[in-house]
Amino acid sequence: MQEPAITPDLIAAHGLKPEEYDMILEIIGREPTFTELGIFSAMWNEHCSYKSSKKWLRTLPTSGPQVICGPGENAGVVDIGDGQAVVFKMESHNHPSYIEPYQGAATGVGGILRDVFTMGARPIASMNALSFGEPSHPKTRQLVNGVVEGIGGYGNCFGVPCVGGEVRFHPAYNGNCLVNAFAAGLADSDKIFYSAASGVGMPVVYLGAKTGRDGVGGATMASAEFDDTIEEKRPTVQVGDPFTEKRLMEATLELMQTGAVISIQDMGAAGLTCSAVEMGDKGGLGVRLDLENVPQREENMTAYEMMLSESQERMLMVLKPELEAEARAVFEKWDLDFAIVGETIAEDRFLIMHHGEVKADLVLSKLSSTAPEYDRPWVPTPAAEPLAEVPQIDPIDGLRALLASPNYGGKQWVYEQYDTMVMADSARTPGLGAGIVRVHGTDKALAFTSDVTPRYVRANPEEGGKQAVAEAYRNLTAVGARPLATTDNLNFGNPEKPEIMGQFVGAIKGIGAACAALDMPIVSGNVSLYNETDGTAILPTPTIGAVGLLASTDEIIGKEVREGHVALVVGETTGHLGQSALLAEVFNREDGDAPHVDLEAERRNGDFIRANRALIKACTDLGDGGLALAAFELAEGAGVGLHLDDAPTEILFGEDQARYLVACNFDQAEALMSAAGQTGVTVTSVGRFTGDTVRIGGSEALLADLAATFRASFAAAVA
């Protein structure tokens, strides 16, 4: 096939700036081949190179006594004791999910699961954090239905429980939805597999499904803004097969028991190109590939297509040659391809051959560790104007408005489409707070949560970044878990705009401060930039996924609200309504500053909850919607009415941080308040759980009526 001439239009179509193309010419001293141009495009885009964010990502805390492996590998690895580790990561599949919702979301799940089992861990839990445009937007229903079906279709067939997540709606996502997928797995802490190649002349082996033309250019597409040519990008979306992925996982984990694996990497963004380059670069080696040996499911595939295909369910491995026969037998047993497609070489070289013809011959390190890196100009986000007066409202009317919104109504419509109990180790399913999964064969359990409040981040990126981590800390604490570590999924607009880069920098500063103060290092993550359509950016959305440990399932704080239980707020309430849910849903306002996050108070109050778990029957953190919404959710979940003391609107619906709502019997309440007095923690009685109505001061409604609104609002908006 005649390869196209390299023209300015072709260079631009590959997402390369003119100055970046000049760098390529300087590096290789000649015009690149078409395949080489594609390789540079894939490796130098934002999705693979982090060229706009690397400088700031380096400032995050990534180490701690519990951290076995931090950022840089397929997933983070954290010690949980007894020779075991939890392996986890969160990653975006935003652009593909907007173009083709079902396959975009499904392959997002598949990709994050591969990141986990590539490290030698069997997946035990998944979550997803989803952001969509306003429900009335003509594309929103299609996106919600397609994304949720895609996540369920892939995860359910693969057989991993979905234990939590988030769903939000906002006009800022009308042109770009966000699909952030999280997965966690268990491994022996001394049997973690890494991606750095070692040894010269070692076989490079292709594993899994065959290569097709799906996903060619996907990583480059995921590093660009959308415009009115979006439909043309549909072929760049990958197609997933969860049954093949299941077989690939079983074969990979079985292969790892043979001792044949030197290094292993899944094929995700930029496919064969990125996996081969990363393995070689991390090991200080070069790689030669012979593409005629690549298993192909389509005829007449070019070198360019094979190198950039993002066909799913594929891995690349460097193998001990003496164990080739044993390794091949494992993959043949699982009816998967096993093909030697190249070898490691001593030179810093990426050599691509196809039927004896050189298709690419590049300096390998220039594609990865020494790729371009930018210090983008940025401007701080201006301080928010003071909050204008917020009128007092009838509290039941305010609560009903929140419950009627798909943002704050029940999410059963979503998680009932997911298998939450497969593997039979889920101790708490989605609905309220963190999900919990038992560590099979032990008394331990792991808790998982995903959190961010984008309105806060837009108003005050640094406080919003802190708040995302602090809320994750509280959600883990509220179920009794000790927070261990975090993964971040940083979703922002165009980093070439100084105001967007300022949001990113501010959020990173806040996340870093909170992770350091709360001993929750970042061990993995993902950056998704250029989430803009026709120049309109999403809300800055730095999603935080976090994992906590319970030494025993006896430590789980339940949701056992009973008739007569006292409702107590742990933490200081001042009545912060800026950027609150009430302000948005009742008054159609998004003004004021984000709530301040006092990290010392977060730690002190979290320690207090865990130390006094024996006195607490139910616990939830106070976030969106404040006391009124949190108290209703506890009451609704238990089927018990709620009487809250009369208080001003800002006290009932304010979103002050570092707070929890707990339920306990009268004697326990007295003991808890006594303990608080000795530790400097504020605990306030705010009402009790009783009857079959929700009464707030002098305003009252039937619990059943409010519950019906709560349970129907999401489906009414999107079904």
UniProtKB/Swiss-Prot annotation:
Against InterPro entries, the record matches this protein to: PRibForGlyAmidine_synth_PurL, PurL_linker, PurM-like_C_dom, PurM-like_C_sf, PurM-like_N, PurM-like_N_sf
Q: Where does Mg(2+) 2 bind?
A: 115, 266
- Report the EC number(s), separated by commas if there are several: 6.3.5.3
Any idea what job this protein has? Part of the phosphoribosylformylglycinamidine synthase complex involved in the purines biosynthetic pathway. Catalyzes the ATP-dependent conversion of formylglycinamide ribonucleotide (FGAR) and glutamine to yield formylglycinamidine ribonucleotide (FGAM) and glutamate. The FGAM synthase complex is composed of three subunits. PurQ produces an ammonia molecule by converting glutamine to glutamate. PurL transfers the ammonia molecule to FGAR to form FGAM in an ATP-dependent manner.
User: What's the protein name?
Assistant: Phosphoribosylformylglycinamidine synthase subunit PurL
Q: Does the keyword Nucleus apply?
A: no
Q: What class of enzyme is it?
A: ligase
Its assembly, as annotated, is:
Monomer. Part of the FGAM synthase complex composed of 1 PurL, 1 PurQ and 2 PurS subunits.
Specify the pathway. Purine metabolism; IMP biosynthesis via de novo pathway; 5-amino-1-(5-phospho-D-ribosyl)imidazole from N(2)-formyl-N(1)-(5-phospho-D-ribosyl)glycinamide: step 1/2
Give the family per the record: Belongs to the FGAMS family.
GO MF annotations, alphabetized: ATP binding; magnesium ion binding; phosphoribosylformylglycinamidine synthase activity
Q: Which residues bind substrate?
A: 92-95, 114, 238, 310-312, 528
What is the active site of this protein?
47, 93 (proton acceptor)
Q: What is the lineage of its organism?
A: Bacteria, Pseudomonadati, Pseudomonadota, Alphaproteobacteria, Rhodobacterales
GO CC terms in record: cytoplasm
Annotated residues for binding of ATP: 50, 89, 488, 525
UniProt source species: Ruegeria pomeroyi (strain ATCC 700808 / DSM 15171 / DSS-3) (Silicibacter pomeroyi)
Keyword check for Ligase, yes or no: yes
- Which SUPFAM superfamilies does the record cross-reference, listed alphabetically? PurM C-terminal domain-like, PurM N-terminal domain-like
Which GO biological process categories is it annotated with? 'de novo' IMP biosynthetic process
Q: Which reaction does it catalyse?
A: N(2)-formyl-N(1)-(5-phospho-beta-D-ribosyl)glycinamide + L-glutamine + ATP + H2O = 2-formamido-N(1)-(5-O-phospho-beta-D-ribosyl)acetamidine + L-glutamate + ADP + phosphate + H(+)
Judging by the UniProt lineage, the source's domain of life is Bacteria
The record's HAMAP family line, in alphabetical order, gives: PurL_2 (MF_00420)
Could you say which residues bind Mg(2+) 1 here?
91, 526
Per UniProt, the keywords (alphabetical) are:
ATP-binding, Cytoplasm, Ligase, Magnesium, Metal-binding, Nucleotide-binding, Purine biosynthesis
